[in-house]
Amino acid sequence: MKLLFLHGLEGSPRGQKPSWLRDAGHDVIAPDLDTYDVRSHLETWFAAGRPEVTMPPAAWSIPLATAQAALSTPGIDAVVGSSFGGGLAMELVRLGLWRGPLLLLAPAGRKLFGITTVEVSRLAILHGRHDDVVPLEDSVALARDAHADATLRIVDDDHRLTASVAAGLMGELLTVLVPPMRP
């Protein structure tokens, strides 16, 4: 399966999640989203005592352009986004650039982008009940309100979802999103 993977603020194209996907046999396109401006913006907002953040588009224009360029790769079967990358994937959907299967891992779409719903063919969300970065309630509402066939998997994990990824839950959800072709 050909996947576009969009990493989080602390992630990278060579991080645990895209590496696991590659090791599982997927063709993974994982661009470096260059999140420096986003992190700087968030540090400024949090230092000013603003816990709820919806970032202005200028703060994420570079990662968005990078994601758009990667999305133009022919044959992408699904988009996978983790935290900030999940919010960025939701922005691609909001802009009408992607309508296919979408796997979101603790997505920061509402928290950082102000996006509360998506219109895609299929949606799967993996979120840890012990996440102290992105509210679990955001994913519950997204799954409930999505204009898509949605699956929400709440797991006994934290924001990084390390145990869940190691247990193969990303792969299980991808199989739900894009069922294997029958011979």
For each feature predicted by the language model, list its residue ranges.
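Conserved alpha/beta-hydrolase fold motif
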Residues: 78-80, 102
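Catalytic histidine neighborhood in serine/cysteine hydrolases
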Residues: 29, 144-161
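Serine-hydrolase catalytic machinery in alpha/beta-hydrolase-like enzymes
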Residues: 1-78, 87-91
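Post-His helix in hydrolase/transferase enzymes
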Residues: 162-177
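Short alpha-helix in the alpha/beta-hydrolase fold that links the catalytic acid
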Residues: 17-18, 135-144, 166-167
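A conserved short beta-strand
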Residues: 98-110
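Acidic catalytic loop of the alpha/beta-hydrolase fold
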Residues: 11-12, 129-134, 159-160
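Short beta-strand/loop motif that positions the catalytic acidic residue
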Residues: 119, 124-127, 131
